[in-house]
């Protein structure tokens, strides 16, 4: 790997941090807006459920997000503030379907200590001011003028230093806040203040409330006419206003999120730390509050946000489990729950650990993550590409084409599968035992190759061979009519739909036939100047049986042409350029947009948007799918149309948000595909590969596939052991007792079924910190080693831990030996046939010794002190890289002769590390708790020992995510014949559920892409006017520095989503053809 790195997202963040509901895209439309770490999603509530309208990245981590409606506006605006003290106000532009920035700014202060409890951003209900609490002791006010424009911000001193929550109150003549705070004796109180815009200070508010519940943590302002505020504690809920005080006791719980149900604010949904959802009701007579009632409704994921949509439908956003769309029913179900889950939205976060494995042994990595937390904990298997789940297969050599046919046009299922070979055609059908067996269609020719087949109107079938077109009854299977090719001419290529046939004979003759009831009529015959290479008349208009247009690919001038049917008038001719002929053309429609796809003989695919009224082609794009000729076929899955591109690297072409996407199919070399929806194998595909015909169902059409293994507890560490085909995890379970105690386990799982095979309970207060599969010198067994710590309530740092060594015997964990340690075993590594452990501040090497009685034990060989806490350790050969709690990366070396570990070099910057990895002998990768990644290099050329002992920082970049783990590996099949296959990659997993890839590029490719990134920065403007350069700059509490040694793959790959005009603008600036740019960026997308 190198110092020239490319960082890109393989899976976008999935943790929901904020959500809100309002009329954002139009005054009549109800929208749900969801924040996921660094992304904003806008959904529309439709009768079919939630419909995604937009999903955009934000150049910042979202700290607060609120909808509000300024005076005189018909729809809501969105206020967003980021953790790096930038804010923006966004508005939806209905005409262009884009976000526009109404206001933006920087609200950072030179002085001031950032708040411990996170940022607070609130908007006065009467839209007079925005309030921000970003630093201890300060409240920042941004006033609105009477036109809804923002005026200059100012700070007001806030006496309360330990602020827990601040909210604006309803129904106040001047903007008024309620502040929930903790004093220096740990008691909690609420105070109210009026904001005086004239004097720019606080005026004592209408009321205050002292000595609340010790767990009071959340304020909910109640709208007019009731007004006042709800104070949510762990054991009580209080309603408070200038003239009322009501309190009710509750079952001990920590409320994590709330959502208002009614506009008048008399009912609220509360979600707690255990995933229970309650309804809180304020009882009142007119405007007088008479009391509070609370009722348990049921269980959801542990909520981070709750948004009530409409008609008892609620969105529950979660950071610890899958987010959910739920319905609240009036009557409870059999289990007494009022909650019905309508939809789940996958969340991988927080990814605490993961491993990369090749379970299917296909040469393709899959990531198995420890995801979620507490009761929502799970394992997730993430893989790239689309899988085919095989249902049946037969050995067949030399397949040249395949088509499925029905026994009558109204049948729901296909009956026949026609398989064509060089000198014969075979017909397969399902027998009573649901097996494929050979049958006959008497009217078909079976001793010649079939060029095309299709179901036809009037319960007929059509077969095209090199010398005839045959029309056959699908019920009697007898020939009803035929058309013969003129003497001396043979049919080279043909296509058909239910009522039309188009074919080309040698010499450039194009013949168009129409199908009637027992009739085949030659309607038109034209002579073209060159030979025809491919044809298509797939209907994309209103009539599913008839096409108005024909697409024709040509030899010699290498063009694709569009003709109008029935009279074969040429309306469009598009020269493709280059020397490779089109091998397959297809007219298709995705999400209401018509396209022409054109596949070339070298594995490239061109796509155009097609104007069906005039045949014009526009927005030409070229991608490389494989290296051999591609055949295109449509199929449908989950009632959407997709296209299968069969070649040496098969892919599925589909559309999402009106954008064409390409996803690899996890099969090697597919020559032909056709849909085969039979009664025994519904929604299946028939796939011809080298020497076999497979029938199987296809996965959901998306780029990454995520399988969930719910375990109902929190997995913290995971490890795979190939020899025993198992995984071992260390996990904790929260016991639902009054004391909220935890139990920790090591569990063994089957690598295929993910069933629990065996469990080993850890001691009281003992938790698993690290896990490893390894073998030792002079011992052929493979072991699982587990490092633990005893976390005692009275200790700041653990003073005791264990290393447990297990062997898997008959699917069970057997403890072979254990070794007590003087601290937490944060990390374990296999090291030259020995075991390397990091224990608190020490690195310790153990060898595997045979005792006299034949048992084995770990014996200490040597160690190295000099760390604050050695949390993360990676090894390569004799080198040991250590990521310290706060002293960045140091490099140690093991000296065999002396049997000692010495420090070789270190990075002298103060970085609080969260993960470390070795890229090669000289380059080391690290990440810190300020969401940066960086690379340091061993200084081999240094003239003095002092210079050589100092590592040089060669790369710095703000990834904007909290990274928990790096692992070498890839999510895609490494294909030996592609340049991309040679690029080394590291995968990382984050708290927000984002999975990223860091790829090391050759320097000349890096330089080219850096130029492209600079051009893209000018053309693609950040949402809310936020700067890309500032966002990606390295940033911690001490310093900010421009990014170096890293490129933003997400920005570079967004080039492919640009309009043709913008692509050309960039192409001019770089002096590189658009096609070449597309090809180079396309290739990068194959890294993930």
Swiss-Prot record:
Organism in which the protein naturally occurs: Arabidopsis thaliana
A Gene Ontology cellular-component term: cytosol
Subcellular location: Nucleus
Cited function: Component of light signal transduction machinery. Involved in repression of photomorphogenesis in darkness. Plays a role in DNA repair by forming with DDB2 the UV-damaged DNA-binding protein complex (UV-DDB).
Main location: nucleus
PANTHER family hit by this protein: DNA REPAIR/RNA PROCESSING CPSF FAMILY
Quaternary structure annotation from Swiss-Prot or TrEMBL: Interacts with DDA1. Binds to KTN80.2/DWA3. Interacts with HTD1.
Associated pathway: Protein modification; protein ubiquitination
Similarity comment text for this entry: Belongs to the DDB1 family.
Annotated SUPFAM superfamilies: WD40 repeat-like (SSF50978)
Residue runs in coiled coils: none
One BP term from GO: protein ubiquitination
Protein name: DNA damage-binding protein 1b
GO MF: DNA binding
Protein keywords: DNA damage, DNA repair, DNA-binding, Nucleus, Phytochrome signaling pathway
């Amino acid at each position: 790997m190198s110092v020239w790195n490319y960082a890109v997202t393989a899976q976008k963040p999935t943790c929901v941090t904020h959500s809100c509901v309002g009329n954002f895209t139009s005054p009549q439309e109800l929208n749900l807006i969801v924040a996921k770490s660094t992304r904003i999603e806008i959904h529309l509530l439709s009768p079919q459920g939630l419909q995604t309208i937009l999903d955009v990245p934000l150049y910042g981590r979202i700290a607060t997000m609120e909808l509000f409606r300024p005076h005189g506006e018909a729809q809501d605006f969105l206020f967003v503030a980021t953790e790096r003290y930038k804010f923006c106000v966004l508005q939806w532009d209905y005409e262009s379907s884009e976000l526009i920035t109404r206001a933006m700014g920087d609200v950072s202060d030179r002085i001031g200590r950032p708040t411990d409890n996170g940022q607070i951003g609130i908007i006065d209900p009467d839209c007079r001011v925005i309030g921000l609490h970003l630093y201890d002791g300060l409240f920042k006010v941004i006033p609105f003028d009477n036109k809804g424009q923002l005026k200059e911000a100012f700070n007001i001193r806030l006496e309360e230093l330990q602020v827990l929550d601040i909210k604006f109150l309803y129904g106040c003549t001047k903007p008024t806040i309620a502040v929930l705070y903790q004093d220096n004796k740990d008691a909690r109180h609420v105070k109210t203040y009026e904001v005086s815009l004239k004097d720019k200070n606080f005026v004592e508010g209408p009321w205050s409330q002292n000595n609340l519940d010790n767990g009071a943590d959340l304020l909910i302002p109640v709208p007019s006419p009731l007004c006042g505020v709800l104070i949510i504690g762990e054991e009580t809920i209080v309603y408070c206003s200038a003239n009322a005080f009501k309190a009710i006791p509750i079952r001990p719980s920590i409320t994590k999120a709330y959502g208002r149900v009614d506009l008048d604010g008399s009912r609220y949904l509360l979600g707690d730390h255990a995933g229970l959802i309650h309804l809180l009701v304020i009882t009142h007579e007119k405007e007088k509050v008479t009391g509070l009632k609370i009722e348990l409704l049921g269980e959801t994921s542990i909520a981070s946000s709750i948004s009530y949509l409409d008609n008892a439908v609620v969105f529950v956003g979660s950071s610890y489990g899958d987010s959910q769309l739920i319905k609240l029913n009036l009557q409870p179900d059999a289990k007494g729950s009022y909650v019905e889950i309508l939809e789940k939205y996958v969340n991988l976060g927080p990814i605490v650990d993961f491993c990369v494995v090749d379970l299917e042994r296909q040469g393709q990595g899959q990531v198995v993550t420890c995801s979620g937390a507490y009761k929502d904990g799970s394992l997730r298997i993430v893989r790239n590409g689309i899988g085919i789940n095989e249902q049946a297969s037969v050995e067949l050599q030399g397949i040249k084409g395949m088509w499925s046919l029905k026994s009558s046009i109204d049948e729901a299922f296909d009956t026949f599968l026609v398989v064509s070979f060089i000198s014969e055609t075979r017909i397969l059908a399902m027998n009573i035992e649901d097996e494929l067996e050979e049958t006959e269609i008497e009217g078909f020719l079976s001793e010649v190759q079939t060029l095309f087949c299709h179901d036809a109107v009037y319960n007929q079938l059509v077969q095209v061979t090199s010398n005839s077109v045959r029309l056959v009854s699908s019920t009697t299977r007898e020939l009803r009519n035929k058309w013969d090719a003129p003497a001396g001419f043979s049919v080279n290529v043909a296509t058909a739909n239910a009522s039309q046939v188009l074919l080309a004979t040698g010499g450039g003759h194009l013949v168009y036939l129409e199908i009637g009831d027992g009739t085949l009529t030659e309607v038109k015959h034209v002579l073209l100047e060159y030979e025809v290479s491919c044809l298509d008349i797939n209907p994309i208009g209103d009539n599913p049986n008839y096409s108005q247009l024909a697409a024709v690919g040509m030899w010699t001038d290498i063009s694709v042409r569009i003709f109008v049917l029935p009279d074969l008038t040429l309306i469009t001719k598009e020269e493709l350029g280059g020397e490779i002929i089109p091998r397959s053309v297809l007219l298709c429609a995705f999400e209401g947009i018509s396209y022409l796809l054109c596949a070339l003989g070298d594995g490239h695919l061109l796509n155009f948007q097609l104007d069906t009224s005039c045949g014009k082609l526009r927005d030409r794009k070229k991608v490389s799918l494989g290296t051999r000729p591609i055949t295109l076929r449509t199929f449908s899955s989950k009632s959407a149309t997709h296209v299968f591109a069969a070649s040496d690297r098969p892919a599925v072409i589909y559309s999402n948000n009106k954008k064409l996407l390409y996803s690899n199919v996890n099969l090697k070399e597919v020559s032909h595909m056709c849909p085969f929806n039979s009664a025994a194998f519904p929604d299946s595909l028939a796939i011809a590969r080298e020497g076999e015909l497979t029938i199987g169902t296809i996965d959901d059409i998306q780029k990454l596939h995520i399988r969930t293994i719910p375990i109902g507890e929190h997995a913290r560490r995971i490890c795979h052991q190939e020899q025993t085909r198992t995984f071992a995890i260390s996990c904790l379970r929260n016991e639902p007792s009054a004391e909220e105690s935890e139990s920790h386990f090591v569990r063994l799982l089957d690598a295929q079924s993910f069933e629990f095979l065996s469990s080993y309970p850890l001691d009281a207060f003992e938790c698993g910190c690290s896990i490893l599969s390894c073998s030792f010198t002079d011992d052929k067994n493979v072991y699982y080693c587990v490092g633990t710590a005893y976390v005692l309530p009275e200790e700041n740092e653990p003073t005791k831990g264990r290393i447990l060594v297990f062997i898997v015997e008959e699917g069970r964990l057997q403890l072979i030996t254990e070794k007590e340690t003087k601290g937490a075993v944060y990390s374990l590594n296999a090291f030259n046939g020995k075991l390397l452990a990091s224990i608190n501040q020490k690195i310790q090497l153990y060898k595997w010794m045979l005792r006299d009685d034949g048992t084995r034990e770990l014996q200490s060989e040597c160690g190295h002190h000099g760390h604050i806490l050695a949390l993360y350790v990676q090894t390569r050969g004799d080198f040991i890289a250590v990521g310290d709690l706060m002293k960045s990366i140091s490099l140690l070396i093991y000296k065999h002769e002396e049997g000692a570990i010495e420090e070789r070099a270190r990075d002298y910057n103060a970085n609080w590390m969260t993960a470390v990895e070795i890229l090669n002998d000289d380059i080391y990768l690290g990440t810190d708790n300020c969401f940066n990644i960086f690379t340091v290099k061993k200084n081999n050329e240094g003239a003095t020992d002092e210079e050589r002992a100092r590592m040089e920082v060669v790369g710095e970049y703000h990834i904007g995510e909290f990274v928990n783990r790096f692992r070498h590996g890839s999510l895609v099949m490494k294909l030996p014949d592609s340049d991309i296959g040679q690029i080394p990659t590291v995968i990382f997993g984050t708290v927000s559920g984002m999975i990223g890839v860091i790829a090391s590029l050759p320097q000349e490719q890096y330089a080219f892409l850096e130029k492209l990134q600079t051009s893209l920065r000018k053309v693609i403007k950040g949402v809310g006017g936020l700067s890309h350069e500032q966002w990606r700059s390295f940033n911690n509490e001490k310093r900010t520095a421009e990014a170096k040694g890293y490129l933003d793959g997400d920005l570079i790959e967004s080039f492919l989503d640009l309009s043709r005009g913008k692509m050309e603008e960039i192409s001019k600036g770089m002096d590189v053809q658009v096609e070449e740019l597309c090809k180079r960026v396309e290739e990068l997308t194959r890294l993930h």
